[in-house]
Amino acid sequence: MKVLKLSAQGLPQSWITLEQAVIHYAAAEVRWESGGQIARFRGGYNAITGEQSVISVNSIIGTRGVPGINPFDLKPSLTNSKLFARDRNVCAYCGGHFHEEDLTREHIVPFARNGQNHWMNVVTACRPCNHRKGPRTPEQAHMPLLYAPYVPSLWEDFILRNRRILADQMEFLIAHVPKSSRLLA
């Protein structure tokens, strides 16, 4: 289970473990909380009062300090799992829906034609379609794209990089994705 760590201004910074969240709470770095309580940690006993220390962790925390991520400079890292999630596990050529192990990263302009490995040049393809297209462009292979590639926003990237998002975390993130996002479909 992960905690969504935000800057004090509400920009996503990272997915952190419960233990990392406890460190932020103990260091008084949590400025605000959102979402529900997901864990409760008990510590030692105060020698004077006899009270046990308790830290309750919420699913979303806003922390003090300067944001580590500038949303305007961000270029999300490209991984197959994020690519397949962006494209909803749908082949860009035949439109079939596949399991992740049956999909490939397909370069629209192939490396053989000086194509680059970036979000705007890759789509999800099933193995047969990727093999059929080979080192050709979609036009040369007479295989038109069924959808256009795009670079995920900061908010979409945080959704794409975590498979076990709690409902309140998803609600928070999805409220900020662009209206044109495929993740809303």
Each predicted region: which residue ranges?
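A residue-level signal for conserved active-site and pocket-lining positions in enzyme catalytic cores
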Residues: 10, 83, 141
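Histidine-centered nuclease catalytic patch
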Residues: 76, 96-124, 133-149
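Internal, conserved structured core segments that host functional sites
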Residues: 81, 87, 95-100
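Short, cysteine/histidine-rich loop/knuckle motifs that typically chelate Zn2+
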Residues: 93-94, 128
